[in-house]
Structures are given as C-alpha cells and as structure tokens.
Amino acid sequence: SVDAGVTPLAATSSDVAVAVPEPMPGGDEQVEYTSVQKYNLRVFDAAGNEKLCIDLSSLTEDSDYFYVSAFAVDGQGNTVLMTGGNALTILDAQGNVTGSIDLSTEQTGVGNIIALADGSVAALVYSEDYSSFDLCPVDMTGMKLGESIASLPTDAYSAAPSGGGYDLCYNKGESFYGYTMATDTEEKLVTWINCDVNSSNVSSASITESGDIVCLSSEYSNTGEGATTYLITLKKTPYDQVPQKTTLTLACVYLNYDVKNMVLDFNRKSSDYRIEVRDYSEFNTDDDYTAGLTKLITEIGSGAVPDLLITDNLPMDTFGAKGLFEDLWPYIEADEEIGGRAGVVEPFFNAISQDGKLYEVTSGFAVRTIAGPASIIGTEPGWTYDDMFAALDQMPEGCELFGLGTTRNDVFTSICTMNLSKFVDWNTGECSFDSEEFISLMEFANRFPETFDWENHEWTPEDNDSTRIKEGRQLLVMLSLSDPYSYTYYSEMFNGEMALKGYPGVPGSGAVFYSNGTGLAISSTCANKDAAWSFVRTLLTRDYQENYGYGFVTNRELFDENIKNMVGQSYYTYDESTGEEKEIKFTQENADTIMELIENTTMVADYNSSQINDIINEEVAYYFSGEKSAQDVAATIQNRVSIYVNEQR
C-alpha cells in the first residue's frame, strides 16, 4: 500500500517495478515549508518483497519540473524511463544510470515506451500524419532509437507486452485486443463491460501465457471516500458453465461513464437478464471518425435494431417515423414509483415526442432562447425578424444585434437549427422550406457580414457580450439556460432587466429545448420490453439524477426541489472589464420566470439531421453569394429535402 500514489508500473517475468513520488512530512503550522518532490524507483519480487529502492533525485537536478511519464524494463533488468516526455534515461539492473536519449529530435513526438515479448524495449513514435505509431526499438548500446519494426494503430498508445500468442495487448474503446506483429493483425478478446468490468477503471491490463487476462480496477466512491483497487483475472470459460440469463443488446457510439455504471449495476442485480453492449465506436478509423455512427445508422435503417439504444447523435426523428422504437409514454404512465406523467418534466418530453409518441427519455435538458433589454424589446415572447431590426434602431449608432464577429452563417445555422422541426414533419413527410418564414430567415441572415477578420482583430475584455451590452454596443444575446446560475449570469448582463424574447417564428415561449443528458430508447421488436424498461427507467429516477444529472433534471420532484432550494442563494461574478466582484441573488421572481419559460416551450432543437443540414447549407450558399434568389434557393431546398425525408420514412 502506497499512500503517495504510484505512477507508471512495469514488470518482468519475476519482478514488478513502480515509480513512487515520496511524500514529505507535514508539521507545525508555525514553520514555513518548501515544496520538495522526490522520486524513488522500487523493485519488488513476486512475493511482494522489495529487492531494490533507487533514489532518482540526481535526475531532477537540471529540471524545474521532473516527472516519469512512462517506463519499461527489459529482459536483462535494465530500466528505461521517459522523463518529461522529451528524454529517455537508461538504468542498469543495479539502478546505475548508463545513458540517455534525447527525444526532442523526434519531430512528431513519442507517445509511450513499452516492453516487447522478446525482452527488448521500444518507443511508440507518432507517424508523420499522426495516424499511427512507428514501433522503434531502444538501442541501449548506441543510445538511440532504431528504425521502425512495425506500424501500430493509435489505440496501441497504452500497449503492454503480451502472452497467449500475442506480441502486444491494448484497449480500444470498450474492448481489449491482442496484436500480432508478424501478421499486423489485432483480435478482440473481450468487451470489458460484458465481463462486468468498468473499462474506465481498468489499468495495467495484460495477457498471461495461459491466455488469462489480468488487470487492476480502481472503483471510486460517489461519497468522496477514495478508491478501492481490485486485482481481476478473466479466464476463458465454456458457455455452458456460465449462469444463463436472457440477453438484451445495447447499441451505442461510445459508452459514457454514467450509462456504463447503469449497465454494470443492472447486470449484477438482475438474476434473469443481462445487457450486452455493442459499442460501434470501435469501427471508427483514423480517416473516418464517424464510421461507427454511419454503420449503426445503416444497420438500424435496414431493420437490424438492437433491444436498447443510446440515442446520442442519432436521427431519432427518422427512426420514429419508421416505427422502429417503442412509445415510452405508456411505461411512464404505468410506473408508480416515477409518478406517471406528473413525475417527469412533461413539457420537455412533450416537445421531443413525435405525434404524441415518446421514443426516448433522458435525464437532463436545457433551453435556448434570445434575450435582450426589456425596455427596448418588451417582455412578451414572440417577434419577427423585422421587429429585431426595429429594436436595433432604438439603440445608439454603431450598436450591433449580436456578439462581436457574428456572421451570416452563424446566424443562419443557429436559427435554422432551432426551427428545423417546424420545416420538416417526419410523420407526414411534408416540408415547408418554400414558405415565407424560411425565406425571411435567409434574408435576415444575409444582412450580417460574410466573415469577420479575427486574425487581425486584437481581442480585449471590452469585446465580451456583457461589457458590450452594458455599454450599448450590443442589443441581444443567444443563450442557453441549464440551471439557475446560468439565468442569473445572463440577467446580470442586462442589470436585472432581461427579457426572454425567443426566436422569431417559434411558438409559445419562443424558446427551444435540447437534451442535456444521455438518451435511451427501446426497440419496438424487443422481446423483453418490461425488462428493458426496468433498465431505461433508471435515467428518470431521483437517485440517478442526484448523482449523475446535469443541467435541468427531468425528474419533476427533483427539478422543483432544485429550483426552490436556489431561491435566495447568492452567486458571485466578476465584471471582466473592471475585475470587480459582484454578488447576485437568485430570486423567487427569477424562479417564476424559469418555470414559465419551461411550461410554455413546445419545440426542440434538431442537432442530428446532418443530411438535411448539408443540403440546406449547400443550397443557401448560392443565395448568400448572389448567384440565386432566396425564392429559387428555397424551392430547391424544398424539393431536395422532401425527397430525402420521404426516402427515409
């Protein structure tokens, strides 16, 4: 047990070595202390007995900040230390320094050093385009890096020497791989979470000669009580010797920490069901970081739908129109613990529903809107693009509508995203891009500059939104509200006289929702829907949202409680132009404004219709360049998007 903390760890067939920063004693408050850092290299045998303790202080004498970023031990007991990321230091088996290698000549940089199965040590040197690693042996005689002997994927950054017939092993996404240099092939051995292991907690994973997988797992407590570290051994076991459970598949593109813990908890507690994760991020390549997402969307579109789905970045409007996923409203209504519709923030879930059907749930949300000074724009939500410029006419000469550097593409993209669900009805396949409203949006955006010369602009604190608004140089701000603090932050910009006016053409409050947490959905073809719901409902529980909720939570009881508890609380902010601290209190009036905003918001922003956005941006460029009229561009967009939408339904 080492309280000071262990940095890198390396091993030979008989010994284990660790680099440990040595803690300095505390003491009397009357005494002035100077910070001192000291590293020891400690070598232990298989029984845990210390064989060697080497003081590395001599290596720190010429460095203001010394640290060991990686090290490896070769078959003869020589240790290679990577210090500060720019040098390798070689020590013999007795701990004597025998030489060093300057890494600053490696222009692309060295990512790591690793011991190989043949007992040698090699450096992982980034390739010229950073798409792979060149595996370069460490020449301990010539004190240099040798020529590359293999090209490894960037996932091999944390590679370790391997037994079981593999040269190296490493993590890749949620899975663990063995790599064979002779054939330049990798083999997926396990998906950690499907073995009830949290990959986020795994370190020092390796493969034994018998093929077992051994790793350390540090599990952290939410109560701040520190971590407990376990030594885990995974053994190949015949399928018929494993307790049998019904499997539910969960597909995702990256598995975040919160849902990972949900899956582990579900699998440990359920005696009848087990969730198996398929993380499509493993199909991403260095050339295409969206390959996994594309593959998942294609498979779902062709009918290969998983039982459960993490909906982040996926076109749920398209999937919903095809009836691929279960309506979750009946499950919420029948769930007595959640409390039915009254137990969730219903306006948000109504907004993300399609034709009254709720295809996904999430733990948090936020609201986007446009705000300005109440004395100029009025307090009632709703206005037109012409109203915006009419309000601007009341401001001093030189005042701008939005923040410094706002271009027409900024304005068009932002407002179009907020309004996209108005122009596309996935349930009927009807589109309305040839409407006066969409044409007005293009014409409004075209009144802004094409570009802003940031390269030649020297930014100062006076350029921030807060200072510009207070000095009458900026009228409005597009903002996101995700908690009471964000409201008071923006309200202070307008000296407490902020009006939430909303986006032109957006009904109700003029604001739009967007999801601020992971979404989950259940396939309409899932054979065990009740079991799937017992997992999905976790997102909506008070316990989950107290621990993992972010922004405005969707559990109604907790949401109301959070708002109520913030009334009277003080926030402190700094005036960026003066540096003065200012206290701001969250009032009951502020709370009422937030509640009214949420209760009257009916639309949701669409960030996931990338194909539609590509069509729109391609065509609107012809209008912005003056090549086509707004009407002609709108007609083309209407035609192209209508065809696309109906092909996808």
Q: How does the language model describe each region?
A:
Residues 329-343, 421-443, 502-512, 626:
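Short, solvent-exposed loop/beta-turn-alpha elements that line the ligand-binding surface or hinge
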Residues 314-369, 386-387, 497-504:
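Hinge/lid segment of periplasmic solute-binding proteins
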Residues 428-462, 489, 498-503:
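Glycine-centered hinge/linker elements that transmit conformational signals in sensory
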Residues 357-368, 387-446, 472-476:
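Extracytoplasmic/periplasmic solute-binding protein
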Residues 514, 573-645:
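C-terminal capping/gating helix-and-loop segments adjacent to ligand/active sites or protein-protein/ligand interfaces
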Residues 276-343, 466-476, 492-493:
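Extracytoplasmic "Venus flytrap"/periplasmic binding protein-like
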Residues 491-561:
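Extracytoplasmic/periplasmic substrate-recognition and gating elements
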Residues 29, 93, 106-118, 123-128, ...:
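Conserved N-terminal structural module of periplasmic/extracytoplasmic solute-binding proteins
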